[in-house]
């Protein structure tokens, strides 16, 4: 495993932290830095205290812990506004030494903080990455050992996590095949048999039927395990020879080094006396199995969405998607954001576009024979079936000009949410930094490769923040997710590079290499106008237009050759809640544009003045009644705040190279398609 060296910085807001305090922060505090995903390998690093003044360094040392730590870390954070974050040290680590213990001065509060996020991140204004740390006990200088940590961990946190599925000995193929040489050696030298479960990619016999080779996948990795079953194992061996792709199995045998090319190990099932055995859990009719062929078109796989997770493509996509969801929560949780569950059913249209799915129970009545069996309610007799059938399908108002929603389930019009933003803003204005992450719905009759009717949105809301803060956090989040996938989904990303997009890894590393370009909307339009004769855009470029995908991609792929952030858009093409700039023509909005996709993130500083917000609602010809509570937020302790929304499926497209958004979600919903 490569060494990782980190610098620990204690940072403060320039606005809130006076320089004079820097001298008081020169405390010889000792922190333990957790560095690895699976084991805590701690290396010597440079500790630096940094404030708004010049950085000041003091001596440090490091130590090494062997083996995984089966317990959480108890980090500390200096009392606000002081926070800590990690950044990678360019210097290589030195040999581990003992950590010295220093007394902590009295009066310095060290409350527990959030867990470690061991990733390389820049300082994010007020939003720093949290650091996994532990303060030394007070006392004289002495060696610091893992025992000091163990003594401070509650007993309830030390319980082992049980293993599930196929008995306690089941091994997931990812642990066996993706763990490197050390993992392979561990399983090869194991004295007890190994149990694996999964589905066959292929089954073939050899040696006149004395051997059966099963290529097995369990979905935990893009790699397969070859299982070699000898006829002497007995049992269902004759039935095994009749199996094909798609059958499910449980195999128990020995992991041995494979003589075949392209695979390090295989599972040998050959000796019943050692506990070797196998079980056919589920058979498949090879003639009917939809995935019997090795290659299938993306369109065909969408028609069998219930089986397409078994394909290499969708299996890899879903593993990456799962890791991106994990990265999302890790990023915001480590920065102190609260996760808010916003409603799916709402009465408000966040975008003001009216493209919403309506939720209603005002459906046609059941057939007359059903109505005849109605039970009495509140002393009233059941209606005559003929009279009930003669009623309008949907109740109307007395003047017959509209639907009578007072008889609907919610007593008013209700819709599936198009965004969690409006619902999460009140929590930002009460609990500070928050985020929501969930499904959203748009009734857009769009058949492009970038749009879905049901998709997931990541929507943070940052308290006491400006548009600048918003852009910094959005860029850091995108980079964090890209780095997370490169670190944790390497095998799948390499599969995508081989089978989906050549040069994918280089493109992702380019996202991390430099700061995103920043350009105002007006400047972007001028650049596109200058490029228009060469680019031959389908839509003419002019100020006030809502840039299309061709313009967004041209900026990132041809002009800046990296992601860029466009800000200060015309107010007429943006939503009502965005804060108006001093020029009266533009709003404090921003979009993060990325190669191959175009818009990935859309955000803004929110309008915090009630009168201006009311004027924007009126200018957009929106009914102010559904937004009464949203405007009322501006009457009671209004604050500047900002936020953004990121389409999660587009993020999956970005890191996998998938070209159609319908292949990034388990069950795609788009016009004319809502099966499964």
Language-model features, listed with the residues they occupy:
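N-terminal chloroplast transit peptides
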Residues: 1-109
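Class II aminoacyl-tRNA synthetase catalytic cores and aaRS-like
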Residues: 29-38, 79, 95-105, 116-676
């Amino acid at each position: 495993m490569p060494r990782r060296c980190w610098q620990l910085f204690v940072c403060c807001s320039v606005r809130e932290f006076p320089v004079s305090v820097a001298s008081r922060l020169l405390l010889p505090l000792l922190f333990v830095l957790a560095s690895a995903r699976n084991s805590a390998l701690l290396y010597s690093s440079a500790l630096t205290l940094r404030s708004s003044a010049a950085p000041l360094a003091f001596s440090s040392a490091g130590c090494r812990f062997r083996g995984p730590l089966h317990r959480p870390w108890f980090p500390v954070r200096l009392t606000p506004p002081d926070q800590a974050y990690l950044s990678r040290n360019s210097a290589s680590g030195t040999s581990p030494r003992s950590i010295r213990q220093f007394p902590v001065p009295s009066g310095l509060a060290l409350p527990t903080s959030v867990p470690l996020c061991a990733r390389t991140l820049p300082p994010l204004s007020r939003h720093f990455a949290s650091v996994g740390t532990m303060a030394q006990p007070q006392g004289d200088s002495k060696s610091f050992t893992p025992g000091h940590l163990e003594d401070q961990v509650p007993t309830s946190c030390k319980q082992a996590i049980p293993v599930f599925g196929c008995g306690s000995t089941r091994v997931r193929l990812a642990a066996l095949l993706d763990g490197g040489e050390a993992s392979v050696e561990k399983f090869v030298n194991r004295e007890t048999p190994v149990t694996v479960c999964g589905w066959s990619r292929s089954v073939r016999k050899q040696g006149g039927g004395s051997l059966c080779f099963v290529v097995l996948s369990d979905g935990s990795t893009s790699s397969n395990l070859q299982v070699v079953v000898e006829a002497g194992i007995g049992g269902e061996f004759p039935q095994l020879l009749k199996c094909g792709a798609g059958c499910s199995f449980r195999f128990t045998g020995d992991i041995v080094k494979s003589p075949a090319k392209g695979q390090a190990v295989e599972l040998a099932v050959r000796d019943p006396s050692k506990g070797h055995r196998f079980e056919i859990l589920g058979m498949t009719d090879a003639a009917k199995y939809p995935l019997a062929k090795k290659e299938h078109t993306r369109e065909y796989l969408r028609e069998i969405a219930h089986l397409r997770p078994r394909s290499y493509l969708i299996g890899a996509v879903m593993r990456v998607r799962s890791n991106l969801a994990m990265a999302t929560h890790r990023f915001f949780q480590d920065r102190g954001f609260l996760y808010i569950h916003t409603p799916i059913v709402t009465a408000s249209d966040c975008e003001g576009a009216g493209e919403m799915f309506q939720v209603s129970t005002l459906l046609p009545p059941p057939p007359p024979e059903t109505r005849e069996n109605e039970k009495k309610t509140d002393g009233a007799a059941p209606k005559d079936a003929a009279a009930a059938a003669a009623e309008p399908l949907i109740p109307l108002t007395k003047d017959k000009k509209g639907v009578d929603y007072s008889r609907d389930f919610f007593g008013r019009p209700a819709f599936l949410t198009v965004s969690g933003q409006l619902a999460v803003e009140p929590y930002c204005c009460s609990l500070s930094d928050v985020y929501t992450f969930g499904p959203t719905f748009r009734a857009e009759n769009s058949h492009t490769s970038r749009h879905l009717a049901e998709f997931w949105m990541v929507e943070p809301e940052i308290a006491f923040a400006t548009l600048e803060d918003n852009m910094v956090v959005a860029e850091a989040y995108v980079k964090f997710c890209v780095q997370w996938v490169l670190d944790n989904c390497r095998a799948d990303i390499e599969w995508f590079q081989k089978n989906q997009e050549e040069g994918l890894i280089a493109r992702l590393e380019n996202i991390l290499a430099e700061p995103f370009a920043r350009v105002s909307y007006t400047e972007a339009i001028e650049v596109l106008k200058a490029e228009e004769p060469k680019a031959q855009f389908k839509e003419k470029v002019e100020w006030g237009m809502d840039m299309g995908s061709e313009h967004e991609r041209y900026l990132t792929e041809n002009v800046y050759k990296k992601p860029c952030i466009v800000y200060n858009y015309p107010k007429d093409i943006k939503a009502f809640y965005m804060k108006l700039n001093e020029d009266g023509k533009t709003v404090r909005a921003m979009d993060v544009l990325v190669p191959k996709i175009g818009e990935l993130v859309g955000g803004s500083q929110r309008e915090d003045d009630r009168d201006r917000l009311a004027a924007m609602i009126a200018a957009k010809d929106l009914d102010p009644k559904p937004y009464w509570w949203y405007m009322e937020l501006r009457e009671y302790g209004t604050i500047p705040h900002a936020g953004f929304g990121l389409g999660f499926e587009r993020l999956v497209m970005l890191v996998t190279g998938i070209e159609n958004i319908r292949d990034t979600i388990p069950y795609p919903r788009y016009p004319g398609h809502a099966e499964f």
